[in-house]
From Swiss-Prot:
The keyword RNA-binding applies. Part of the 50S ribosomal subunit. Belongs to the universal ribosomal protein uL22 family. One of its GO terms (molecular function) is structural constituent of ribosome. HAMAP family: Ribosomal_uL22_B (MF_01331_B). This is Large ribosomal subunit protein uL22. PANTHER family: CHLOROPLAST 50S RIBOSOMAL PROTEIN L22-RELATED, LARGE RIBOSOMAL SUBUNIT PROTEIN UL22M. Keywords: Ribonucleoprotein, Ribosomal protein, RNA-binding, rRNA-binding. GO terms for cellular component: cytosolic large ribosomal subunit. Disulfide bonds: none annotated. GO terms for biological process: translation.
Amino acid sequence: MEVAAKLSGARISAQKARLVADQIRGKKVGEALNLLAFSSKKAAEIMKKVLESAVANAEHNEGADVDDLKVSTVFVNEGRSLKRIMPRAKGRADRIVKRSCHITVKVADK
């Protein structure tokens, strides 16, 4: 049995979120949550909430035991980008791209 949780439009770039996703992929849920709790990255806090949601979905919907669950799949896709303008000297302007991403975490009991 495989259960998923998804967060759409997380306000962090996909590149930064993938660094954290690579750390927890394939690990047991308890170990992954512990790793995320002590990470200093912004993406770790976001990823922890999504993982906890996936675990809660597995418990509530499938009646799974938390000790048997492991992170089977984690992937991060690019979301919408907000384009902003930063005024510069001599009438110029630079474009600022505020990136977002979609995070999907799947947990399985095998």
